[in-house]
Every structure is written in structure tokens, then in C-alpha cells.
Amino acid sequence: MIHSIKRHQFLLLFMIILMCSPALPALARILTSPLSQSVCEKLAPSFEAELARFNAQLGDPIFIRIFKESNELEVWIKGGKQYSLFKTYEICSYSGELGPKQQEGDRQSPEGFYFVQSNHLNPFSSFHLSFNIGYPNNYDKAYGRTGSALMVHGSCVSIGCFAMTDPKVEEIYTLAEAALKNSQPFFRVHIFPFRMTAENMARHKHSKWIKFWENLKEGYDLFEMDRVPPDTTVKQKKYVFDTDDRYTKAISNRSYSAKISQVR
């Protein structure tokens, strides 16, 4: 028993060193700071037990979804073939109204499908810790949209970013940094105006952004179907999803179910 406890403590210490070290050659080279390292070392032990419930560990791939209307940021963790919802964080502050960001200085938070690479992390942020979501993406550029440095960060002040407070961003940042260090080349950040249910879409059907949101809903539905974030590209000013026929099958299944219901 004592030997087992010591072995567990050794493995935990090794994991903390592995995930929180600034310069292990086997890991991706990621900019760190004394703050990001101390935060990682502080949170790693508690994350071990929490992530184990999802058959996951610190450094496994993550996926983030943001919903403006309900002020929610979800962190999903991949412990097997699919992602599981790890935690939902309340967004302290974001800017503007429902709808996409269009230009620099409009004080509007973006919507769409983005991804974060290791060079998007900022451990020296003026807002505690932060990462750039990658706005503008190819879709935004196709519409001539401008803006820069759109972040998920600490504090509770936003001029286009998603401000989470310092304690919450510490957790989100540590999970993101560990995943990128552990060979996830990037993680996706999907930003929606609201949960893209049929009821919510109907409630907003008169919005000038409804066509844009219908395009976002395609990607939302794919993830809801099998808990795997779809690969996303932009063609002819639209988001296009590499579905492996997932979306087509889902539509067919829903149509079939609807016909059965009508017969009954």
C-alpha cells in the first residue's frame, strides 16, 4: 500500500513537471511565464482527479464552445474517440450584441469557427492570461471584416473579447496549454450567438443574421450528433464541413423519423 501511494505521488509529480515545464524538448515549444508555470503547478493535482472521471488526463485534446446569449464557455475534453463536457464556465463579460464582429473598433465579439495554435497563447497578458481565438478567419476575411487581438482572457472587462475573470481563465488556459504541449496541433473554438436549437432559431427568425446563423447551425448540429468537432473550411463565402456523410445521414434519419411520426 505504501509503495503504491509513493508510486502514485511520483507519477503525479512527473506529470506536473512534464505539463508545466517550459522547455522539455519532447514537447511543443510554447512560450511560458512564471505566472503560467505557477498556475499550472497549482492546478495540475486537482485536474488529475477531475479529468479521471472522463477517462482523460491533463494534456488530452480539448475543444471550446462559447454561447453569447447564455454567457457560457464550455470546455470539452477528449478521453477516447469522442469529447466529453468537462466544465461550463460563466462568461463575466463580452462586448456587443448577438451577431458577428464586422470591423475593428466596433466593440463586438465575434461568432464563427476558429482555432487556436500554440503561438496564440499569451502568458504575459495584461489581462492575467489569454489566448487569441484567431479572428479574422477566412470566412471573416471573405466578407472584408477587420479586427485583431480578439481574446479569451482574465479580468471582467471586454472591448470585443471574452473576459472570464482570473480564476476561471487560469483553468481554461492551463487545459489549453497542456493540450498544445502534448501534441494537439490546435484546438477549435466555436462561437455561437445562442444554443442553435430549433426553438431558438425560430425565436430569432427575423434577425438580419438568420442566414449566417443557419450556416453556423450546420456545424453545431454535427457536433451535437456525435461529439466530434467537424473539420471546417470556407468556400464561396460559406462555412463548409468535412462531414464524412455525417450531416447527410442525420438529415435523412430526421426526415425518416418525421415521416414515421406522420404515419402514426
PLM features: what roles do these ranges have?
Residues 161:
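Active-site nucleophilic cysteine motif
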